[in-house]
């Protein structure tokens, strides 16, 4: 099942309201659902589902609808799968944000190690 961009956005809005207000501290760019699919720049058959950004524009979270839709099509997702994947990704990116505020990089390091392990197994 492929949710429309608007349906996915509505789900994401509902989920975002469930997170504590403290998580939004200094997240001046908020959370955006962008239409594109983003593939791994290294050319692997991997999609980037979301990213936490801290740059000249500020701190913000981008989630990529097209990446979710591509996997949903490949894996024949249900609405529950959409909910799980959106929530997991949003939680993951919030963790990057909160760690960043604390000057930590633990999740960033774990992400890199997991990606390296995945590439070795392929």
Region annotations inferred by a language model:
Residues 90:
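A conserved beta-strand element that flanks and buttresses the S-adenosyl-L-methionine
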Residues 44-87, 97-119:
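Active-site scaffold of zinc-dependent metalloenzymes
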Residues 93:
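Walker B catalytic acidic pair
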Residues 2, 9:
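Phosphate/ribose-recognition catalytic cores of enzymes acting on nucleotide-derived substrates
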